[in-house]
Amino acid sequence: MCGIVGIVSQSPVNESIYAALTLLQHRGQDAAGIVTVDDENRFRLRKANGLVSDVFHQEHMLRLQGNAGLGHVRYPTAGSSSVSEAQPFYVNSPYGVTLVHNGNLTNSVELKEKVFKTARRHVNTNSDSELLLNILANHLDHIPQDHLDPQDIFYAVRKTHKDVRGAYACLAMIIGHGMVAFRDPFGIRPLVLGKREENGKTDYMFASETVALDIVGFEFVRDIAAGEAVYVTFDGELYSQQCAESAVLNPCIFEYVYFARPDSTIDGVSVYAARVHMGEKLGQKIAKEWADEIDNIDVVIPVPETSTDIALQIARVLGKPYRQGFVKNRYVGRTFIMPGQAQRISSVRRKLNTIKAEFKDKNVLLVDDSIVRGTTSEQIVEMARSAGAKKIYFASAAPEIRYPNVYGIDMPSRDELIAYGRNVDEIAELIGVDKLIFQDLTALTESVQLENPAIQGFDCSVFTGEYITGDISPEYLEKIATQRNDNAKKKREKQASNLEIYNEQ
């Protein structure tokens, strides 16, 4: 999972991109990068492992000159955590092209072989984002004229759609031309467009979430549609075109459950409002299925932070007190998206501490957005017991996650998912709770559709095992499980520790 941002302006963009990336930091804490185009048509690039505030210092910001640029925050779902795979990526031909990407390609092995054999392009890392850049650049390279017009750009995007499979929200910047934003035919990963009027001219901005627009004073215009490309020249002229055949919006449902900030709006849906609906529906299910247990519940406590709005609605529906029983250390990364199981285990207790008075001698209903590996849930339950809870009920705002995600979320193996092959009682025993309940999938999708009924479908593959791109085989799932387990990641990081190319130090 990643966060991306791009700005075409009449004034320097380095500080605005930096500010926007800090608002997208929740989407990835592994690495960050910014690239700009200066007055001499040169790319200025800085990228490294770490948080935005750690990667960019004053000397880096001063070098990132120019009125157009891209930014990226990364959590690796493929490849390694090596700085060589931090984004943006860059190729010098044709023109000079740089790209940032959120998502995951599902046919990268075949594509890497094809791009070398047919285009003689070398992809230096295992990143599918570098591969995607080379595919786009190759199609641009086959356009005969020296200067590209908007239709040429859209032609290259159409050809790219025909080549690649999977999830991709992308921004690419072409020297001497402009910036193009495009989204896969299912719109699995989010991408929004904003504008700002300045000195009688219009600046444009693209970002993964609307919250990034807000901080730098851009007005939300609309979402980039599934399969659409939007091109902005460096002179500020905007063009758009549908570039994919049979494009149908199916956004990732997990964006609304977990990833996106509550103050963002994605595909016409307020993330906050969707979570309120999730809480209402889950509260109604609890009231119905646990009717004999409701009187025993003393207090409803959220697991910070995504579930707070959900838990508040559950407490309202059940008529129970809502309390903050955990205090979060905001300077520790999100545990679900931290690379490595050992890191996740050690991080939970550094991330959360209990307010013991809210647990002591009480029957508590803990509410979390989801249960993925079960690592976090098990430790949270242990903390609640240690704080004196008599009985622990647990409610998940998402259904059981039984299948790996192949579209940009780090759920590589069924064996790493606690719900795979287990029923609710078995999961409850493993995480140590007295009673456990999950949201129904229908209730979850309805919670989002209440905010935008025009969305007819979602990517729900982690719950159903049905992959909307239609190209996922059991062999593919086995392959990524082998490639992405923790031991494999450690091996790749050791092998690729020093591949830093085109990087401002």
From Swiss-Prot:
Co-factor note (free text): Binds 1 Mg(2+) ion per subunit.
Reaction equation(s) it catalyzes: 5-phospho-beta-D-ribosylamine + L-glutamate + diphosphate = 5-phospho-alpha-D-ribose 1-diphosphate + L-glutamine + H2O
Segments passing through the bilayer: none
Cellular component GO terms held in the UniProt record: cytoplasm
UniProt-listed Gene3D superfamilies: 3.40.50.2020, Glutamine Phosphoribosylpyrophosphate, subunit 1, domain 1
Involved pathway(s): Purine metabolism; IMP biosynthesis via de novo pathway; N(1)-(5-phospho-D-ribosyl)glycinamide from 5-phospho-alpha-D-ribose 1-diphosphate: step 1/2
Name this protein carries in UniProt: Amidophosphoribosyltransferase
Organism: Haemophilus influenzae (strain ATCC 51907 / DSM 11121 / KW20 / Rd)
